[in-house]
From Swiss-Prot:
This is DNA ligase. PROSITE patterns: BRCT (PS50172), DNA_LIGASE_N1 (PS01055), DNA_LIGASE_N2 (PS01056). Coiled coil: none annotated. It catalyses: NAD(+) + (deoxyribonucleotide)n-3'-hydroxyl + 5'-phospho-(deoxyribonucleotide)m = (deoxyribonucleotide)n+m + AMP + beta-nicotinamide D-nucleotide. GO terms for biological process: DNA repair; DNA replication. One of its GO terms (cellular component) is cytosol. It comes from Erwinia tasmaniensis (strain DSM 17950 / CFBP 7177 / CIP 109463 / NCPPB 4357 / Et1/99). Signal peptide: none annotated. Belongs to the NAD-dependent DNA ligase family. LigA subfamily. NAD(+) binds at residues 32-36, 81-82, 113, 136, 173, 290, 314.
Length: 670
């Protein structure tokens, strides 16, 4: 006789199978009424025997209580973005870069997929069960959207099949099919509710609902396209084979995937998909081209925020014609003056566009643009609106006059020889530059001052409370409570965040200064090379050029910034008066360091409880170690934290020395 547990297990298995048939394969196996009957039977059994209820039951997709806010999630493996190609020439340039880096003239095998126009998400499965879902966020930190993702029936709450890793992080895209989007908007129109401009906005808005019961009513689906974290298991060494493995475990994968063995194969796939785009039933904005071999992917590696082995080959953006009403000039944080066309509003690719960038004076001259002209507007990459051409010059059209003085502060505008950008010379006396510089300084990747949003910065500058980054640290809770929507508790939280932000790293400090052309990766290279602020400030251009990824242009920007007396004074105030500080960066050759880690290739795996992974990495590097992300025959040492998986197993298989976190701390001298 069948036991109660067996009956419940059987019902769950049936329902999961029917969900997969319906939502993933689009091939319903039973009538809706039969599915509803089985679901009702399972709900009754679980209600009568709550001790048998599990979190991966099909009944648990909907019903979680509304959240007050989304929890932040730090990605254990960063979710990187992709570089773009917008035409055949830039795609062929990508292909050549890959061949050159691999030192091969042979045609490579690429796995080509659709570039879905939705929201990138991460799904973490432990022992086959979905335990967490998160947005991509900034690639390092996202938001926990588990309760909402559990309502998407295309996403299995438990994986099926064999050889499922202990921990598996799947990356993919949540999106809304066009039919569901149109039906949802039609219902909203009839009810006098908000309608969404396009399916992407609808998908993003649905996933960011604090009440998962609302998300459950939205017609969302999902395709997976890649792997993040993998522990306690193995995956094939081909991207295509990995997609097939995902499918075998019950994860939805697009059927428009092809292995291409030459550039002509890739272009054929691109043009076929472009032709089929209107009939797909969901929005895409291009195709993604990935080197299929994992070995070659590892050889190619990454640049700062994107892999070298993949590119997003975008479709030509959608275009519309409209009228230029006016041209205004915006001032950025580095003083760059950008002309912006104010347009007769027009719908382009599902978005109402009323402004478009004109880039610079040369672009206005190239276009021959005048105020009143009829122009072609394009959303480049389907995102940033820009003016492409003039199609009709109106009677009475007015010339665009580029300002000789800053429209914000009145300072002179200059154009440096060799640069196309005109800049305000006002520096931090310019309100626009001041706002931009302060917003950059407090941003997450810079000093990461929690609670210091754009609207607060705008008020601080408008009220003349803050004129430079150093003055942020002089703010009091009393002064902050004078700002709009800033109560005593919020004000104190900002003051506390400012105090906390004084403890930073040399690399973050350099990035926060907002030196032109110095991004995160360049700031990290400068910090590692010079070690101290004094050494960097004394470096001439020839010395700066010796830093990895720093060319003559970047070196000139760094030197010019540091030569400016007002910038040097702000740096002095930040360090000496405000007390911004960071751990010493010791720049010593590995062979000169007396440390058990000196000159060793070290891999960290599992969860650390004493130090964060970033802190451990910095400490090891300071002692001359090279910290790698993967185990190979070249690895000297593996440091295993809790729940260490496949890396630990591989290290043991290769006979590599393994220590735990406690031993690492002892060797660090703690």
């Amino acid at each position: 006789m069948e036991s109660l547990q067996d009956k419940i297990t059987h019902l769950r298995t049936l329902l999961r199978h029917y969900e997969y048939q319906y939502h993933v394969l689009d091939a319903p196996a039973v009538p809706d009424a039969e599915y509803d009957r089985l679901m009702g039977e399972l709900r009754e059994l679980e209600a009568a025997h709550p001790e048998l209820l599990t979190t991966d039951s099909p009944t648990q997709r909907v019903g979680a209580a509304p959240l007050s806010a989304f929890e932040q999630v730090r990605h254990e493996v960063p979710m990187l973005s992709l570089d773009n190609a917008f035409d055949e020439e830039s795609y062929r340039a990508f292909n050549k870069r890959v061949q050159d880096r691999l030192k091969s003239s042979d045609d490579l095998t690429f796995c080509c997929e659709l570039k879905l126009d939705g929201l990138a998400v991460s799904l973490l499965y432990e022992q086959g069960e979905l335990v967490r879902a998160a947005t991509r966020g900034d690639g390092t930190t996202g938001e926990n959207i588990t309760a909402n993702v559990r309502t998407i029936r295309a996403i299995p709450l438990r994986l099926s099949g064999d050889n499922i890793p202990e921990r598996l992080e799947v990356r993919g895209e949540v999106f809304m099919p066009l039919a569901g989007f149109e039906k949802m908007n039609e219902q909203a129109r009839r009810g006098g509710q908000k309608i969404f401009a396009n399916p992407r906005n609808a998908a993003a808005g649905s996933l960011r609902q604090l009440d998962p019961r609302i998300t459950a009513k939205r017609p969302l689906t999902f395709f997976c396209y890649g792997l993040g974290l993998l522990e306690g298991g193995e995956m094939p060494r081909s991207h295509m084979a990995r997609l097939q493995q995902f499918k075998a475990w019950g994860l939805p994968v697009s059927d428009r995937v092809r292995l291409c063995h030459s550039p002509s194969d890739v272009l054929d796939f691109y043009h076929q998909v472009e032709a089929d785009r209107p009939a797909l039933g969901f929005d895409i904005d291009g195709v993604v081209i990935k080197v299929d071999s994992l070995e070659q992917q590892e050889q190619l590696g990454f640049v700062a925020r994107a892999p070298r082995w993949a590119v997003a080959f975008k479709f030509p953006a959608q275009e519309q014609i409209t009228t230029v009403r006016d041209v205004e000039f915006q001032v950025g944080r580095t003083g760059a003056i950008t002309p912006v066309a104010r347009l007769e509003p027009v719908l382009v690719a599902g978005v109402m566009v009323s402004n478009a960038t004109l880039h610079n004076a040369d672009e206005i001259e190239r276009l021959g643009l005048r105020i009143g002209d009829r122009v072609v507007i394009r959303r480049a990459g389907d995102v940033i609106p820009q003016v492409m051409s003039v199609v009709e010059s109106a009677e009475g059209a007015r010339d665009v006059i580029f300002p000789t003085h800053c429209p914000v502060c009145g300072s002179d505008v200059e154009r440096v020889e060799g640069e196309v950008v005109a800049r305000c010379t006002g520096g931090l006396i310019c309100g626009a530059q001041r706002k931009g510089a302060l917003k950059h300084f407090v941003s997450r990747r810079a000093l990461d001052i929690d609670g210091m949003g754009e609207k607060i910065i705008d008020q601080l500058v408008d009220k003349e409370y803050v004129k430079n980054p150093a003055e942020l640290f002089e703010l009091t809770a009393g002064k902050l409570t004078g700002l709009d929507r800033m109560g005593p508790k919020s004000a104190q939280n900002v003051v506390d965040a400012l105090a906390k932000a004084k403890q930073t790293t040399f690399a973050r400090f350099l990035y926060a200064l907002g030196i032109s052309e110095v991004g995160e990766a360049t700031a990290a290279n400068l910090a590692a090379h010079f070690g101290t602020l004094e050494a960097l400030m004394a470096a001439d251009i020839d010395t700066l050029i010796t830093v990895p990824d720093v060319g003559k242009v970047v070196a000139s920007h760094v030197r010019n910034f540091l030569d400016e007396e007002s910038n040097r004074e702000i740096i002095r105030l930040l360090v000496e008066k405000a007390g911004v500080n960071w751990p010493d960066v010791v720049v010593v050759k590995a062979e000169e360091i007396d440390s058990p880690f000196a000159g060793k290739t070290v891999v960290l795996t599992g969860s650390l409880s004493i130090l964060s992974r970033d802190d451990a990495k910095e400490r090891l590097q300071a002692l001359g170690a090279k910290v790698s992300g993967s185990v190979s025959k070249k690895t000297d040492l593996v440091i295993a934290g809790e729940a260490a998986g496949s890396k630990l197993a591989k290290a043991q298989e290769l006979g590599i020395d393994v220590i735990d976190e406690q031993e690492m701390m002892r060797l660090l001298g703690e």
